[in-house]
Amino acid sequence: MMEQYYEIKKQYPDAFLFYRVGDFYELFEEDAVKGAQILELTLTHRSNKTKNPIPMAGVPHMAVDTYVNTLVEKGYKVALCEQLEDPKKAKGMVKRGIIQLVTPGTMMSEGPNDAKDSNYLTSVVTTEKGFGVAYSDLSTGEVYATHLKSFEAVSNELLSLRTREVVYNGPLTEQNKEFMHKANITVSSPTPIEGEHAEISYVGQNLTNSAEKKATEQLVGYLLSTQKRSLAHLQVAKSYEVNQYLQMSHTVQNNLELVASAKTGKKMGSLFWVLDKTHTAMGGRLLKQWLARPLLNVDEINHREEMVQALFDGYFTRENAIDALKGVYDLERLTGRIAFGNVNARELLQLSRSLEAVPTILDALDQSDSDVLKEFAQKIDPLKGVAELITTTIVKDPPLLTTEGGLIREGVDKQLDRYRDAMNNGKKWLAQMEADERQKTGIENLKVGYNKVFGYYIQVSNGNKNKVPLDRYTRKQTLTNAERYITPELKEHENLILEAQTRSTDLEYDLFVRLREEVKKYIPALQKLGSQLAALDVFCGFASVAEQNNYCRPSFHTDNQDIDVVNGRHPVVEKVMTAGSYIPNSVEMDSSTNIYLITGPNMSGKSTYMRQMALIAIMAQVGSFVPADSADLPIFDQIFTRIGAADDLISGQSTFMVEMSEANDALQYATKRSLVLFDEIGRGTATYDGMALAGAIVKYLHDKVGAKAFFATHYHELTDLDETLDHLKNIHVGATEENGKLIFLHKILPGPADQSYGIHVAQLAGLPKSVLREATKLLKRLEAQGSEIAPASQQLDLFAQPEVNDSEEVQAEQAVITDTEQNILDDISNLYLADKTPLQIMQLVADWQKDLKDDK
């Protein structure tokens, strides 16, 4: 057996080999040692009596999926080696072979948290002109292809797709290997495929670009070689260009938190969290795809908005459709499992129940007053025949396994009914036969019996042998005092009774497979229906969100890049705040203004204001309504951001290098139709270097790029740029002081901020009083120095001993007042001495002293 194991293992050296032995899958050698550690299995040994016992660990075959998923989730591959013949019938060694190679990009099972996530396997081929890229989610059969000019563009696509595995046809540079490793992407080599396969030609039939075609052939070839079965559900590849959509790099999508919070990596806190009111897994996946690829075509956007508008206006239509959608399972992945051959009876019933919900959805749409909803409904095929086929074949509550019987309804197959009748009524039939034969023959002591050697028989005593009807009875066994006989009828029922269970189970499985193969004929229609219901689910969700959050339908213009958003709101921030407490802000940028230079204190809302604009643009071009009183927008072709201060762990770049790289992307690739968000450019380096770079970048954006840009800064010297840059406008986020406390107004106001309130924000953060006092002194000195930018040799040494007069130092120390100090000052101011005795005043002073000591 071990020779067979080693021979198979040789073919899959980079995978865990799960080797079927009876009711277990066994791991041997290094696989066992490593697998036992990862899967928390008991490590044993085979051939313990030898000098070199073989490490071994096993898992029950019934639970193998759980263990396989654990390994694959960690980035490993698993080769499933199955027994290919019945061990009882095998002559010699049981024949075994690999039935499937499970890899990170081909895993089809899912947990409760990833039903709305796609699992993409991506194929990349190098060509003379660049790269061909094709990717697929095996569980749904969708296939997409494109071509890119640089590996940087490929890397961005891989990150945006959240690809788990890449099939790459060439050697990777060390830098690219490092990228794949840090991005947690498994890299696999292409696998040669022998002979012609219909799937390869079918999937790539509409591709005209040679790079895309090669990438798709490599993709499908890898899937066929690893899955080792027909993949009839793979769809015709859809070719696309990245510039067909609003382009956003992976970094931009992360900065704007489109599908996950930047802090937690979870759904909560993202735009997806706000917009996801879908009730199907496929609707959730489609929404994520739309958020990553907003549209550029105004007609397509308007069509989506018309659907949302109709569902927004038609409350009962929407609610009836939603109620029906709640009963729809994941048609796309159910279809994939049907094609894959691992669907069970319960899942087929899920399919039929999903199809049974479609007529209700169609009725809701047909009864609406909206032509666009009626047109949408007319394109949907409810596939009634498929649902009926399943429900008339499968029992209402079938078992999970398809090999143990109990799947098929009565009346579906006459032979199966006879088997079941034999199983359920065998003893009753034998008793009845015994009574009938006694009556027919007149032999009162005739009996029907059974033994394991001869099976069922009719026993007649020697005294009654002359009454036996030999034309019907055949002698089977002679005893001392009796004879045993068999009849054709008894023999027939003997076979039914003894083999009914086995034959019934086998026949049920055969009937189930026939049903599955019949349903498989409808795969293209089921996939189309799934995509239609997914889109409807998203539209209903958009309408619900718009109603709940008081969104408006945006309008678009293509003759200029003017922005007019009245009382816009950040969709995520608004949701986590108390209802009605969010302070809205407008954006009015006509042809006279291309750049908003935004100043104001930290925490005042500068970043929120900028992100708000980007999210409104994305929501609008996805087809959603937007959080504003009104919005008239241009079509943006790209969004660039420089937000946040963090090192790029994947590329190994420092904070400042990341900052400059992201700024460079905008300066190099932004067009007049782009939206640019820059937050605190230059803070990753020395003050004057940063200020100089920030000023130069603003000027370049103004003079060379011409995009609509939001530029937040603490370099107040930059606000003077409005004197020389005609299309730059200063705005600031309002703040005020009350009783020494900083109050954020969160309102966008014209002109630059008069100060940044940095020390006040530090006070809110709880910095020690001594630090705040020292900062106040230093601020006084810097303000005394003046705002002119001096060369490095003349820049102020912050830590040199200054010449500060006593009055300035006192003013500096008094500038920072804690809450405790303010309360004491208020008590003194309100104290009426005539009402207090000397002892009471002494007690008050003692209390104040104690409070001041506790406050230090």
From Swiss-Prot:
CDD domains: ABC_MutS1 (cd03284)
Binding positions (ATP): 600-607
Gene3D superfamilies tied to this protein: 1.10.1420.10, DNA repair protein MutS, domain I (3.40.1170.10), MutS, connector domain (3.30.420.110), P-loop containing nucleotide triphosphate hydrolases (3.40.50.300)
Tree of life domain: Bacteria
Record's keyword terms, sorted: ATP-binding, DNA damage, DNA repair, DNA-binding, Nucleotide-binding
Keyword Disulfide bond part of the UniProt annotation: no
Keyword Transcription: no
Record-linked InterPro entries: DNA_mismatch_repair_MutS (IPR005748), DNA_mismatch_repair_MutS-lik_N (IPR007695), DNA_mismatch_repair_MutS/MSH (IPR017261), DNA_mismatch_repair_MutS_C (IPR000432), DNA_mismatch_repair_MutS_clamp (IPR007861), DNA_mismatch_repair_MutS_core (IPR007696), DNA_mismatch_repair_MutS_N (IPR016151), DNA_mismatch_repair_MutS_sf (IPR036187)
Classification via Pfam families: MutS_I, MutS_II, MutS_III, MutS_IV, MutS_V
Name of the protein: DNA mismatch repair protein MutS
Natural source organism: Lactobacillus acidophilus (strain ATCC 700396 / NCK56 / N2 / NCFM)
